[in-house]
Amino acid sequence: MEASGKLICRQRQVLFSFLLLGLSLAGAAEPRSYSVVEETEGSSFVTNLAKDLGLEQREFSRRGVRVVSRGNKLHLQLNQETGDLLLNEKLDREDLCGHTEPCVLRFQVLLESPFEFFQAELQVIDINDHSPVFLDKQMLVKVSESSPPGTAFPLKNAEDLDVGQNNIENYIISPNSHFRVLTRKRSDGRKYPELVLDKALDREEEAELRLTLTALDGGSPPRSGTAQVYIEVLDVNDNAPEFEQPFYRVQISEDSPVGFLVVKVSATDVDTGVNGEISYSLFQASEEIGKTFKINPLTGEIELKKQLDFEKLQSYEVNIEARDAGTFSGKCTVLIQVIDVNDHAPEVTMSAFTSPIPENAPETVVALFSVSDLDSGENGKISCSIQEDLPFLLKSAENFYTLLTERPLDRESRAEYNITITVTDLGTPMLKTQLNMTVLIADVNDNAPAFTQTSYTLFVRENNSPALHIGSVSATDRDSGTNAQVTYSLLPPQDPHLPLTSLVSINADNGHLFALRSLDYEALQGFEFRVGASDHGSPALSSEALVRVLVLDANDNSPFVLYPLQNGSAPCTELVPRAAEPGYLVTKVVAVDGDSGQNAWLSYQLLKATEPGLFGVWAHNGEVRTARLLSERDAAKHRLAVLVKDNGEPPRSATATLHVLLVDGFSQPYLPLPEAAPTQAQADSLTVYLVVALASVSSLFLFSVLLFVAVRLCRRSRAASVGRCLVPEGPLPGHLVDMGGTGTLSQSYQYEVCLAGGSGTNEFKFLKPIIPNFPPQCPGKEIQGNSTFPNNFGFNIQ
């Protein structure tokens, strides 16, 4: 249906595009003439246009021949199958044209593909279907007995609605011995009888005569009408009335009211008495004149009896008779010219109208119409216009106008136009006619879908359920119908290694995005891809937008203690000299968290201790320090449980167990060797054990650090290959440890070992870091710092 509609629309455009050329050319071509006798029955054959135009029947049907008329009524109809031009109805020449001869009805013939335009006319031929009729069936003629032979007496004429030879041809009078009748012709072509006296009358012999006047037309056979003429023979009256002027010319506006004084005629009679009394009357007035004017018989004032209409009759020739009391009369002629006033508004006849029209086609013909005005002169001149703010224009050819688009339209800016065609004449006052029409604009796919955002950022928390709705994209299309229906799709990723089709999917109808599988922040922190939106137009238009998916970390990893190792083997023992000052660094708990952000921010606290208050843990970095001075009363062995907790919700934690051994004589960085050294065998054995233990711990610690670094680097490499990894960042809370450096120890611990001699027990006497904990030159400040030790070092003491 849509394709068919577009085809019809194109055909109309082609037709109307050539119409102006056809109209201008048609004015110069000789019109084709046809004729038909009036009173011919409707549907009667006039001509075969196919033969007249030299077209075969198939070609005639293909070219869509049409017959149009400038008037509001077309009296002809065209059979599209046969090409026969037929009458619509029975034609009455007298109703169509009155006394106008010839009676011609004009029409136009339009052909399409290619466009042609012919002027044609149909002449309605008069038949003798009306008989002459005398308006006055009886006429009285007063004739003085003193009238000499040859005196003429004009009689009232008969009326015949037919024209040409079917109109009145002559008059005859019944046989008599005194009168004969002559047929006279007026200036307007109408014929009237004139009674001529052949033999003088004698009132004493014959006071009156009765004659029959017959009017004959020229038809075949002729028709006739009769009237009775009564002739009254009068005594002698030798002076006839005379008008002041034999001819009067007056002009009167067609809008003059009934009763308006047209003119006053005046006649005088030199006779006196009864023979000098004059009466005025309309002489030989037609039915139309008798209905339109009246004359005062005493004063000679001619007045209007009904409203004039310039469009029907432009002038009247009125004969006035002034008769005295005797037999004499005088006559004059009054020519009354009707002045046109602007009393008819212009008329608009719509021949073709197209709606809707495509938005991207300039100079598309929207409407074809004709204008006319029954007035004349300036009152009949017409101007045609539309609103100035519309993208349409009018082109004219004769009295035809074409409304067409001035430029390509945009349906998205305006889907319809209300056009008012204003037709105004140039009369005073000006009259106008307005025709309103609504033109709909058909949509063309000239707008691509537009996303509401150029890029979208979606957040998905890791460990999501498959098929989770993670967000939506939206695009709109300013077109309508199928041109505005949007389909969404995933575009191929720029990174060929990104398994996009296994990560997300999109609903083609509404743009909803779904995660196809559970995401792991530690494996993939984020990725980006492009989505496309295409409409259903022809050709289809599309656009695209960028979508970023950020995987939000969930606290799904507990802290992992790197040092001291918690592998269930021999516990790690830290040696602390009893002479250690408060704040002495015992060791440092090192831990990492596989999560990120605040889920990886770690804090440390002393969960359990053999002797509460002796040791404390620095909450920020996990350093274990002495909280006070050691005494001889303190136990030699201590077991500490350090809790490592992240800042996730809910938080996760791990526990590190430390063994601390308090050792005598371990208070100075370097102690002198005893005077009596142990035996060589005992010293060698103890040294070997100590070196092996220290090497094992150091190797295991170094291996753990390297393994952790390798794992982190491997994960970052994998995340970079899948997509850009976006890790949330934020300020580090003051009470948490920054895990920069992948959780490795921030200080390298080095130990020196000394064996005490003389006891013979190979007792381990000295082990401490070479990095001093406090400046040795300021013992006073160290003691002062003990008073604020927990605040300065952030210990968590049990």
Swiss-Prot record:
Residues 29-690 are extracellular. InterPro entries: Cadherin-like_dom, Cadherin-like_sf, Cadherin_C, Cadherin_CS, Cadherin_N, Protocadherin/Cadherin-CA. One of its GO terms (cellular component) is plasma membrane. PROSITE patterns: CADHERIN_1, CADHERIN_2. Residues 712-798 are cytoplasmic. GO terms for biological process: cell adhesion; homophilic cell adhesion via plasma membrane adhesion molecules; nervous system development. Its main location: membrane. One of its GO terms (molecular function) is calcium ion binding. The chain crosses the membrane at residues 691-711. SUPFAM superfamilies: Cadherin-like. Residues 36-134, 139-243, 248-348, 353-451, 456-561, 568-671 form the Cadherin domain. The keyword Hydrolase does not apply. It is found in: Cell membrane. Keywords: Calcium, Cell adhesion, Cell membrane, Glycoprotein, Membrane, Repeat, Signal, Transmembrane, Transmembrane helix. Glycans are attached at residues 418, 436, 567. This is Protocadherin beta-13.
